Amino acid sequence: MRTGSITRKTEETDIAVSVNLDGTGTYKVDTGIGFLDHMIEQFSRHSLIDIECRVKGDLHVDQHHTTEDSAIALGQAISQALGDKKGITRYGHTYSPMDEALCRVALDISGRPVLVWKAAFTQPRLGEMDTELFEHWFQSISQAAGITLHIESLYGSNNHHIIEGIYKGFARAMRAAIAIDPRKADAVPSTKGILGG
């Protein structure tokens, strides 16, 4: 089993995250932000990564620190679980429809974190969550997990459908990328022999 566990405590947040990359998509998520919980649960369910994520953050200030730090800890746990990355497929991509909305996600577990974000929202909030924080969440998980990540909202009119399609697309792309290729189970998927740098 490929598992990772991270605890992270600062003056702003207190976080415990654990993941099992070879799971079935079970989750226990409590960030204190209901909409963010819903999105992380979608990521777990559709990636088949088991996730436990508990965050106590300074929500009396705003949601920024909780959103950012949850993504950092989750990315670190995924990176830890991937280890030397031997045998992984490495790349994943998907088109993800959610009713009238369609998004495209492509990623490379390269060790070189990059986020290209092409998505916009017509509302400042979804539930109690600021929509500007979604890009920051993906930026943070990309950095912490070492993922090159391209996200595009191709079209859609419902803000909830757009972001849920993005999270589900990210999940399905990750599911493909972390899968073990039995033909190369003992090899790092790079001609350099390492991923990163």
From Swiss-Prot:
Coiled coil: which residue ranges? none
**Which InterPro entries is this protein grouped with?**
IGPD_sf, ImidazoleglycerolP_deHydtase, ImidazoleglycerP_deHydtase_CS, Ribosomal_Su5_D2-typ_SF
A Pfam family (short name) is IGPD
Q: In which pathway does it act?
A: Amino-acid biosynthesis; L-histidine biosynthesis; L-histidine from 5-phospho-alpha-D-ribose 1-diphosphate: step 6/9
- What Gene3D superfamilies does the database record attribute to this sequence? Imidazole glycerol phosphate dehydratase, domain 1 (3.30.230.40)
The EC designation for this entry is 4.2.1.19
Q: Which reaction does it catalyse?
A: D-erythro-1-(imidazol-4-yl)glycerol 3-phosphate = 3-(imidazol-4-yl)-2-oxopropyl phosphate + H2O
**Location(s) in or outside the cell:** Cytoplasm
Name the enzyme group at the top EC level: lyase
GO CC aspect terms: cytoplasm
Q: Which GO terms describe its biological process?
A: L-histidine biosynthetic process
A single Gene Ontology MF term assigned here is: imidazoleglycerol-phosphate dehydratase activity
Q: What are the record keywords, sorted? A: Amino-acid biosynthesis, Cytoplasm, Histidine biosynthesis, Lyase
What CDD domains does the record point to?
Answer: IGPD
Q: What is its main location?
A: cytoplasm
HAMAP family reported for this sequence: HisB (MF_00076)
Q: Which PANTHER family match?
A: IMIDAZOLEGLYCEROL-PHOSPHATE DEHYDRATASE, IMIDAZOLEGLYCEROL-PHOSPHATE DEHYDRATASE HIS7
Which family is this sequence assigned to?
Belongs to the imidazoleglycerol-phosphate dehydratase family.
Q: What is this protein called?
A: Imidazoleglycerol-phosphate dehydratase
- What is the organism field in this record? Novosphingobium aromaticivorans (strain ATCC 700278 / DSM 12444 / CCUG 56034 / CIP 105152 / NBRC 16084 / F199)
Q: Which gene encodes it?
A: hisB
